[in-house]
């Protein structure tokens, strides 16, 4: 699942991947726009509480805003609203995950976090190979 998210994230201008405090995250100029981890017992209980799932679960967190954030917040599973940031959104990754939707959400999150110069560069280059 990490590789599938990374396949989109690494096509975005100057994005880079790094190990996070847990899991893997993708960043643009020091801002995290996507983070994949396994929510499990212990110090990650806040993820379990946010998802409502007690077993170890792979999750993606990303940034969203406006109408999209509102729609995702109301959508229910596989989406959940983490409490730690007003723009943070989460998605449980599982067998039935719509990977085209993940690519779109990761790209939108990048647009939210990236400087406008890079967003314009992305707009000129068109959709990522994953979105085509």
Language model region names:
Residues 1-132:
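Charge-dense, helix-prone N-terminal extensions
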């Amino acid at each position: 699942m990490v590789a599938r998210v990374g396949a989109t994230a690494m096509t975005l201008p100057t994005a880079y991947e790094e190990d996070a405090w847990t899991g893997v995250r993708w960043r643009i100029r020091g801002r995290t726009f996507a983070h994949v981890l396994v929510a499990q017992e212990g110090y990650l209980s806040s993820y379990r509480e946010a998802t409502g799932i007690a077993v170890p679960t792979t999750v993606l967190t990303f940034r969203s805003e406006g109408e999209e954030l509102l729609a995702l917040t109301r959508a229910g599973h596989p989406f959940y609203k983490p409490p730690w940031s007003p723009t943070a959104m989460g998605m449980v990754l599982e067998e039935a995950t719509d990977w085209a939707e993940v690519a779109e959400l990761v790209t939108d999150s990048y647009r939210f976090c990236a400087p406008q110069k890079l967003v314009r560069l992305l707009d000129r280059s068109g959709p990522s190979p994953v979105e085509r």
